[in-house]
Amino acid sequence: MRKIISFLSLAVIILLAAACKETSPFKYESVPNDPMKARIYTLDNGLKVYLTVNKETPRIQTYIAVKVGGKNDPAETTGLAHYFEHLMFKGTQKFGTQNYEMEKPLLDQIEQLFEVYRKTTDEAERKEIYHQIDSISYEASKYAIPNEYDKLMAAIGANGTNAYTGFDMTVYTEDIPSNQIDNWAKIQADRFENNVIRGFHTELETVYEEKNMSLTSDGRKVYEAVLSALFPDHPYGTQTVLGTQENLKNPSITNIKNYHNTWYVPNNMAICMSGDFDPDKTIEVINKYFGHLQPNPNLPKLPVTHESPIKAPVVKEVLGVDAENVTLGWRFPGASSPEEDLLNLTGEIVNNGKAGLLDVDLVQQQKVLSCYAGTYGMADYNAFVMSGRPKQGQTLDDVKDLFLAEIEKLKKGDFDEGLLEAAINNYKLMQMYRLDNNSSRADMFVSAFINGVDWKDEVAQLERLSKVTKQQIVDFANKYFGDNYALIYKREGKDPNEKKIDKPKITPIVMNRDSSSVFLKEIQAVEVAPIEPVFLDYDKDLQKLTAKSDIPVLYKQNMTNDVFSLMYVFEMGTNNDKAMGTAFEYMKYLGTSKKSLKEINEEFYRLACYFNVFPGADRTYVMLEGLKENMPKAMALFEEILADAQVDKD
């Protein structure tokens, strides 16, 4: 679950406050002491717009999130949300086509034939119908311009064109130059309002391939087995985002159109942006292009599914070619639950890569080959999982028993209270890093919107975390961790369910690579104000100091967040000594005469700091990073290692 953190001390209860510039007719909500200074608008048609300004680079990360995903798929057409995500790149009446008036009758015929096809059971008849679909699709392709959406994005200098579908959401991503907001909004509004389903059967082939690949992915099979065990009555467990083979072989364009008209409406969408822009001007542009979209006053609501308590382990077995492993999973409340904070901290205490229970007791003591723990993070329910691979001569049940022993330690409070403080510090560090990145900042908005979390609660998270006690963690663990878990054995062997979907033969379509729509030409012809480059001036932008030992120091204050980054540059590398790189890398595994490696790892984790080594031919770079407030202690600890490195014989 992605959260936003406030690194300013919140001395008062955070209240969501309405604010509005006198110069703008658009009212927005904001939260005091929000480090992102987010503005949250709601247009008259219900469209949510989340804006945060970050002028580090002249670019803007945009996400358009739709609150619909695999859990909303009709039972007879599972995989629909994911499939439609693919079709959103096929164009509209204005682009992706040379002549929509000529193309439309053919597309209508294809839609009607697919309705007949999906209801036909005789294989010979189905084959004949699909042949007709293929023939008409070829004729329709003469009018289509495949990949013109990509050309539009290239025309405005966009990067990272992509989309993803989960159980709870479908999200469309673009990273655009700061001077292309108008063009971007114009294209996206047309795309979301006037989507045309073309290239259907060829895209179906792509979806088939994705499904076929999933059938041989042992990790995905384990994931789906965990969900089916924990959520036997909820769509999380009863269906998958990719859909069943049977449903994918019987698609319905009519159902997909109804799906678009039902869910892809402004009162079920959010535009999330982070970057270099004027929020007052930006909301005007968004309203100009998206403000006329019609909401759905009858937006469906999924029936609330109350899962029955799990009273004994639900055991499942997965077969595949990957190495054997075992996974345990427990069910928890969803992302908007007040207990989400406790779950996040519990996850850090159990496994953080440095000083968690699994790290210290199992990984560092080499009791298993490998292991990890974490959460799935979904809106309606959450899941906490532990997964591990056995050593040679060890059974999957041995690993399971080791996991359960660690859970018992958690429930008994058999862990240092300082681990909780350290977990909070590291959670704070993680969120600080996210403030540095436009993609992460905008993604926080997406998570809040999809999970139904008020922004004030996101901003106040660190304040809440700082008040959590060890006893609360222990009580939480005893409340949720019992014999109520999913137990998935991943064993080596041939999976009898790996029956791939046969792809029907299709005629290669006409690509029309050199064609362009009028819409694309109009976008290409738009003149925008150029972005003026800003160059680093070493004399003005960097402060130069000299340490007591005459070592030169270059310094630049971090004005974005409370994270420091310190680089030690050693004028020696592998050209001086071939063992140099290995020697510096070995530092990560050394203790000192006063501290063991375990103690050093725990102290770095407590400080929410870490170091990395980058050996080069002529220089070696050592990077020390972490919370600014702990920089002196982290430097002292690191320099203690440099001065007194010792092999930890234990």
Question: Where are the language model's segments positioned?
Answer:
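Proteolytic maturation boundary segments
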Residues: 20-51, 278-319, 325, 329, ...
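M16 family metallopeptidases and their MPP-like homologs
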Residues: 52, 57-70, 79-81, 97-190, ...
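Metal-associated gating/positioning segment near the N- to mid-region
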Residues: 75, 87-99
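Non-catalytic, conformational "gating/processing" segments within enzyme and secreted inhibitor domains
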Residues: 204-205, 219, 223, 253-289, ...
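Short, conserved secondary-structure transition motifs
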Residues: 208-216, 305-319, 423-434, 624-627
